[in-house]
Amino acid sequence: MSTSQTDNVKASTHATEYDSVTNNIVVAALYKFTRFADFEKYRDPILNTMLDNDVKGTLLIASEGINGTISGTRQGIDNVLDYLRSIEEIGSFTFKESYTDAQPFYRTKVKLKKEIVTMGVENIDPLQSVGRYVKPSDWNALISDPDVILIDTRNDYEVKIGTFQNAVNPNTETFREFPEYVAKELDPSKHKKVAMFCTGGIRCEKSTAFMREQGFEEVYHLEGGILKYLEEVPASDSMWEGDCFVFDNRVSVNHNLEKGSYEQCFACRMPITQAEMQSPAYIKGESCPHCIDKATDEQKARFREREHQMQLAQKRGEAHIGSDVIDVIEKRKAAKIEARRQADAANKTKAG
């Protein structure tokens, strides 16, 4: 198995360095495929460790492993990562870091799932078969080979704001559509060398394993994903074009792993440019040029009311700069969880 599955890998240098004053929020993206049969019992301990350290974000756990992105202070992130490593079934794992000056998540969640990344195909096991890992330093040479077909495994809206030169866009709306794309567009007898990439590497673990099962023998994928490539390859040598979409409030990051030039429509969640925000179709919290003709009147009314309630909450002082009503709600939930945990502990003490 590659070091991407077995070692705690974190580069010593980053495009944007940690700064205790400005870039003081650490964003850690992690995953590991592993045999995790009793994963359900770890949901609450993991969640409580995140809450105790004021770490936000979402972690998915399933019988096939763990996946997610979390953010917090340097000490908070280190404490959570140390706890995850202490779980025997998880142990060491790869994670990628970037830094920002504002909390990119509002919520703290640990979800129980059937899969840590959903492809919708049964019995795809990256622990048994997977593509060949290619380090960021070797990626340019591989994708410059005219015999290699380069495929972006991400969703269409991600591809549109940035991708590698000459990459093929499968035009999928979700990762579940990828197997259908392969069946229709790719042929092991014609496409002898296939290179694939995604944001952090996890989708390629599944997609390359699937490709191997379909008879594609020479399948490669970018180790650590786009984020690791942007971290390690200088912009002057880069074959990446545009921003990289990320699943948090930063929306996208540029080549320096700093917040990119995109915002997000809170109605449809699509990345939008500053120019699109000047469009008559853009109404904050309600619509944008991507969804103005897709949302029903009922949906628009619901979006409008949500935006209204958020503004009212801010006026009441329930939210403050750098936060919003969702953050307040999540803090209340966290307090309830803590109260329930203490009550359970007290009941167990009495019973004993």
Swiss-Prot record:
Identify which top EC class this enzyme belongs to: oxidoreductase
Q: Which GO terms describe its biological process?
A: tRNA modification
Query: Known SMART domains for this protein?
Result: RHOD
Which InterPro entries does this one have?
Answer: Rhodanese-like_dom, Rhodanese-like_dom_sf, TrhO, TRHO_N
- Ranges of residues in domain Rhodanese: 144-238
The secretion signal range is none
Q: What EC number(s) has UniProt assigned to this enzyme?
A: 1.14.-.-
Q: Name one Pfam family in it.
A: UPF0176_N
Catalytic residues, chain numbering: 198
Q: Keywords assigned by UniProt?
A: Oxidoreductase, tRNA processing
Catalyses: uridine(34) in tRNA + AH2 + O2 = 5-hydroxyuridine(34) in tRNA + A + H2O
Q: Which GO terms describe its molecular function?
A: oxidoreductase activity, acting on paired donors, with incorporation or reduction of molecular oxygen
Q: What family does this chain come from, according to its entry?
A: Belongs to the TrhO family.
| NCBIfam families in the cross-refs | PRK00142.1-4
Q: What does this protein do?
A: Catalyzes oxygen-dependent 5-hydroxyuridine (ho5U) modification at position 34 in tRNAs.
The name this protein carries in UniProt is tRNA uridine(34) hydroxylase
What organism does the UniProt record list as the source? Psychrobacter cryohalolentis (strain ATCC BAA-1226 / DSM 17306 / VKM B-2378 / K5)
